[in-house]
């Protein structure tokens, strides 16, 4: 799909944050792959994915993949979606190469299959656009240096040791969807690609 990116397991990053440059590269790769599908309306969808959502909620480029589990940092949604795409592309390619020569997909069939992989993988969580925002929350910290420098009246103790309460910015969910993530993602995609923009298999 993307001629200047070799899709191997090595393309799947394992980290807990992304630099501005890494986010920009991810967005460039994702945009290029989706544009190559040639689906009508895909450029309008991409414009929406990176646009300002307003009300403090995050777009596709800046959203995390979750509030406190996988990809819980800015750009985590992009990274998670790209990782799914890389692995799905590898699986599809390997499955085709294992077939007998006569049974292998022709070029146009292979292109259609890879296009579907791109749509399904990169957009499966698109319902999380406008889904996350940040708000201050109180949490315990057991950081020895912070506890040492705190006022004595602020130091508490529990089974894990001495701690203080601190206010940190944390992700919170603003869920306006009336049904599950899969159905919500399909509904969003079809707003831009039309009701014929997805195959039956992609809707599943």
Which ranges hold each PLM region?
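Solvent-exposed, flexible loop/coil residues
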Residues: 64, 81-82
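Generic N-terminal helix/loop capping motif
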Residues: 33, 48, 52, 87, ...
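Divalent metal-dependent catalytic cores for phosphoryl transfer on phosphate-bearing substrates
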Residues: 68-73, 79, 86, 93, ...
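Residue-level signal for alpha-helical context at structural boundaries
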Residues: 48, 102-103
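Non-catalytic interface/linker regions that flank or bridge core catalytic/transmembrane domains
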Residues: 1-63, 67
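A residue-identity detector for tryptophan
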Residues: 27, 48-49, 82, 87, ...
